[in-house]
Amino acid sequence: MVKGTLYTYPENFRAYKALIAAQYSGAQVKVADNFKFGETNKSAEFLKKFPGGKVPAFETAEGQYLSESNAIAYLLANEQLRGGKCPFVQAQVQQWISFADNEIVPASCAWVFPLLGILPQQKNSTAKQEAEAVLQQLNQKLQDATFLAGERITLADIVVFSSLLHLYEYVLEPSVRSAFGNVNRWFVTILNQKQVQAVVKDYKLCEKALVFDPKKYAEFQAKTGAAKPQQQAQQQKQEKKPKEKKEAPKKAAEPAEELDAADEALAAEPKSKDPFDALPKGTFNFDDFKRVYSNEDEAKSIPYFFDKFDAENYSIWFGEYKYNEELSKVFMSCNLITGMFQRLDKMRKAAFASVCLFGEDGNSTISGIWVWRGQDLAFTLSPDWQIDYEVYDWKKLDAKSEETKKLVTQYFSWSGTDKDGRKFNQGKIFK
């Protein structure tokens, strides 16, 4: 098992590749303490190990040194992430890694960095169109595929996902990303993997795209010392010509580091709050109910639910899948439910659901009972939660009616039939 130290600054998307790979493989990676970009990586000690001064950089426990984020991720990965035993899948992994570096990252930087004040805004820029063209390629690929290479998550998914983080955080607002539904589902699925959640924390999808702000650009340039080209030119004229020649190439050799500094600036952006925080908490305690439901028989847990339920601040909803006629294999239908749960992971704190599959292969339906804080559809509170809900018909139920109590009892106890008489097959709990 690989052990070592990773040199990087917080929330560097390039370092995420390696850290996520390590979560899958079990590699023991320590992130270097007190790393400061622009100082640590320019020190004589660091440059002796990594002459390029680039980050992320990795030092193994045996004293071996490796740079370039994709190479580090490969070292820390396991066989599955590298493509398994199939040479073609291995080649596909490399294909998508190259695609990320050559197509996604340049388009993302050209679109996002000017909006963050890192680069000047270019007139007649085609960055947005180029990024959307890249996303369209991905969308087509993912139309009939769950993952980018093979049937399981690989470095292809990890690297492409990491390269898309800035786009999904800063510019792909709902109206824009709606054109890339396949990519959206894949992106949120990867985001909600526990190995990814351990690395990419408190991430929120873009709600409103950034716009260029000249003031922000001026402030960033002043902070990094790059906003005074005229003053630098005047100083160079006053200095001796030999010195002027020495400094000219130095500035041209630093663009890669400027992009790393940009990532550092991105990490300082404020994170959004839990969408449920704006709603009254009421008296219903989801944690207590979930504990009772998990540990007690339905004969106790269901009466407990109705006894404690706060109808003033919480609501009960019935959700029915719109395209039941398209369902085929039972296991595939169950994957639809599980995938939705994964994409709604951050909603669990103030929600509960029992979603059931009725019927059999080629003749089945999906429907469920959902409970959450608030009186309106919870999915509209956050773009993160809007991937799947539109493929369901939603009906708000009267918590005090006997009909609702019977329906809740049926779904919470996994029993009965659907409205057309199909027998209960299996269920999934969102808690």
Curated annotation (Swiss-Prot):
Gene Ontology terms describing biological process: regulation of organelle transport along microtubule; translational elongation
Residues in GST C-terminal domain copies: 86-212
Pfam families in the record: EF1G (PF00647), GST_C (PF00043), GST_N (PF02798)
Annotated spans, Disordered: 223-261
Domain called EF-1-gamma C-terminal: residue spans: 272-431
Role description: Microtubule binding protein involved in regulation of microtubule-based transport. Probably plays a role in anchoring the EF-1 complex to other cellular components. Probably involved in formation and/or development of mechanosensory organs during metamorphosis. Required for cellular and organismal viability. Not essential for the innate immune response to bacterial infection.
GO CC terms in record: cytoplasm; cytoskeleton; eukaryotic translation elongation factor 1 complex; nucleus
Location of the GST N-terminal domain: 2-84
Modified residues (Phosphoserine): S294
Subcellular location, record wording: Cytoplasm; Nucleus; Cytoplasm, Cytoskeleton
Listed GO MF terms: microtubule binding; translation elongation factor activity
InterPro entries in UniProt: EF-GSTs, EF1B_G_C, EF1B_G_C_sf, Glutathione-S-Trfase_C-like, Glutathione-S-Trfase_C_sf, Glutathione_S-Trfase, Glutathione_S-Trfase_N, GST_C
Start-end of Low complexity biased regions: 226-236
Source species, domain of life: Eukaryota
SUPFAM superfamilies hit by this protein: eEF1-gamma domain, GST C-terminal domain-like, Thioredoxin-like
UniProt lineage: Eukaryota, Metazoa, Ecdysozoa, Arthropoda, Hexapoda
Organism of provenance: Drosophila melanogaster (Fruit fly)
Keywords for the protein's UniProt record, in alphabetical order: Cytoplasm, Cytoskeleton, Elongation factor, Nucleus, Phosphoprotein, Protein biosynthesis
Gene designation: eEF1gamma
Keyword Ribosomal protein: no
Self-association and partners: Interacts with microtubules. May interact with BicDR; the interaction is probably indirect. Interacts (via C-terminus) with Doa; the interaction is probably direct, is transient and leads to phosphorylation of eEF1gamma by Doa. EF-1 is composed of four subunits: alpha, beta, delta, and gamma.
CDD domains: GST_C_EF1Bgamma_like (cd03181), GST_N_EF1Bgamma (cd03044)
Post-translational modification: Phosphorylated on Ser-294 by LAMMER kinases, including Doa. Phosphorylation on Ser-294 by Doa is required for negative regulation of microtubule-based transport.
Biased composition (Basic and acidic residues): 237-254
Induction behaviour: Produces at least 2 transcripts by alternative transcriptional initiation encoding identical proteins; one of these transcripts (EF1gamma-RA) is induced by ecdysone signaling during pupation.
Protein name: Elongation factor 1-gamma
Result of knocking out the encoding gene: Increased larval lethality. Some adults survive, probably due to maternal contribution, but have shortened posterior scutellar bristle macrochaetae. RNAi-mediated knockdown is larval lethal. RNAi-mediated knockdown in sensory organ precursor cells prevents formation of thoracic bristles. RNAi-mediated knockdown in the developing eye disrupts its morphology.
